[in-house]
Regions:
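C-terminal catalytic "cap/lid" subdomain
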Residues: 1-94, 98-355
C-alpha cells in the first residue's frame, strides 16, 4: 500500500480564540487511523505547539521575544502530544513524537538515522508525529514553515503521497477558479498568511513542487473536509494536485533536495553538456569556484550565466579545486602527486536538475 505524509497547520488546529481545537484533532486522528487500517503507512507533520503553549501559559498575544516563543513551544509541544495520544487511543493506534531541525536532513548520517527511525516506528505499528524542534531552531537551521518540513520528510522517506492541508479548497487562479492540477504557468489569486501560521500559500507551492520533483504526488486540499484525502487516493481531485516526476535514487534525492550546499562551482558549456550526458565533472570544465568547502561537502553547479545545473558531492576542497580548474586530467597526475580519478564530482554523486 501507500506511504503517506500529511501536514496540518495551525490555521486548522487553532480556534479563533487561540485554543487548540480538540474535536479537529480527534477527527484528523480518525482519518489517519482509517488510512493505516487499510494497510497504508502514515506520518503526520503537525504545527500548533506555539499556540498550545500560549494557551497553557495563559499568554494573550503572539508578540514575544524569541526565547519566550521557544519556551512556549516547549510547553505547548507536551500539550499537543497529549491531545494526539488521547485521540489516537480512541482508534487503538499508538503514536511517537519526533522533533526535527533543518540540520537533521542536511547532514547525511543524521538524515539516515532519522529515516531509519521512521522506518522502525512504522514497522512497530506506531504513527510518527513530527514537528520542527522550535526550542533549538535558529534562522540558520529553521525550516521556516512545516510545509517545507513535510516535503523534506516525504522526499527522505520516499513517500508516495504528500497532503498539505489548508483552510481553503486548494489553489485558486486569478478568476477565482480552483486549479485542479498545478502547472508553473498558472496565475494565482493572492492569499494571505494566517495569524498562527508562519507560512502562506507560496510556501505550500514551493513544498509541493519540491516533493513532486522528487517523485512524490502532492495535493493541497481543504483540511476542513478530511474526506478529501481518501478521495484523492481514489483518483479524484478535490484540491490542487502536483504530478510527480520519476523518483531519483535515494542518495541522489538527498543530494538534490535535502542536503546543505557549502559553495558553488561555475562550469563552461562543455562541462554542462557532459553532465547532461551523465558524465562526471572534470577540472577542465571549471571556470570559477565560489565559497569554501571541504572534501565530501555538497556544492551547487552553475553555468557562467547563473543557470543551476545540479548539485554534487565534491572529491576536492575549494582550495584544491581552484588550483586545478581548467586543467586536462592528463596534466594533473604529476601535479597532484596522486593516482586515481581526478574528477571533481563523480556522476554517481551528482544530481541533475530535472528538465
Amino acid at each position: 500500500m501507500a506511504k503517506i505524509v500529511i501536514k496540518v497547520g495551525s490555521n486548522l488546529l487553532v480556534k479563533p480564540n487561540g485554543d487548540i481545537d480538540k474535536s479537529y484533532i480527534i477527527e484528523l486522528s480518525r482519518t489517519i487511523a482509517g488510512l493505516k487500517k487499510k494497510g497504508n503507512s502514515c506520518i503526520l507533520i503537525t504545527s500548533g505547539a506555539k499556540a498550545a503553549g500560549y494557551g497553557k501559559a495563559q499568554k494573550a498575544n503572539c508578540e514575544e521575544e524569541l526565547y519566550i516563543k521557544q519556551a512556549l513551544c516547549a510547553i505547548g509541544q507536551v500539550q499537543l502530544m497529549k491531545l494526539y495520544e488521547l485521540a489516537f487511543d480512541m482508534y487503538d493506534e499508538k503514536v511517537a513524537q519526533i522533533l526535527i531541525n533543518r540540520d537533521d536532513f542536511g547532514h547525511r548520517q543524521r538524515f539516515l538515522n532519522l529515516r531509519n527511525t521512521l522506518i522502525g516506528l512504522n514497522e512497530m505499528g506506531f504513527i510518527p508525529i513530527a514537528n520542527e524542534n522550535d526550542t533549538v531552531a535558529t534562522s540558520e537551521i529553521t525550516f521556516g514553515d512545516n510545509d517545507i518540513l513535510a516535503a523534506m520528510t516525504a522526499i527522505g522517506w520516499k513517500s508516495d503521497y504528500l497532503f498539505l492541508l489548508s483552510s481553503v479548497d486548494g489553489l485558486m487562479d486569478d478568476q477565482d477558479r480552483l486549479i485542479k492540477v498545478f502547472t508553473k504557468d498558472v496565475v494565482l489569486k493572492k492569499m494571505e498568511k494566517t495569524q498562527w501560521g508562519s507560512g502562506g500559500i507560496e510556501t505550500k507551492i514551493r513544498a509541493a513542487r519540491a516533493a513532486s520533483a522528487a517523485g512524490v504526488r502532492g495535493c493541497i486540499c481543504n483540511g476542513r473536509d478530511l474526506s478529501a484525502i481518501e478521495r484523492f487516493l481514489a483518483g479524484q481531485n478535490p484540491g490542487t494536485g502536483f504530478e510527480p516526476s520519476k523518483k531519483p535514487a535515494s542518495k541522489k534525492a538527498w543530494i538534490g533536495f535535502l542536503s546543505h550546499t557549502k559553495g558553488e562551482i561555475i562550469i563552461n558549456n562543455g562541462a554542462k553538456r557532459a553532465l547532461m550526458m551523465k558524465k562526471s565533472l572534470l577540472p577542465v570544465g571549471i571556470v570559477d569556484v565560489k565559497g569554501s568547502f571541504e572534501i565530501g561537502d555538497v556544492i551547487d553547479v552553475r553555468t557562467v550565466d547563473g543557470e543551476k545545473i545540479g548539485r554534487g558531492i565534491v572529491n576536492f576542497s575549494s582550495s584544491q579545486t581552484r588550483g586545478i580548474m581548467g586543467y586536462q586530467s592528463s596534466q594533473l597526475t604529476q601535479q597532484l602527486n596522486r593516482s586515481g580519478s581526478t574528477c571533481i564530482v563523480h556522476v554517481d554523486n551528482f544530481w541533475l536538475v530535472p528538465e
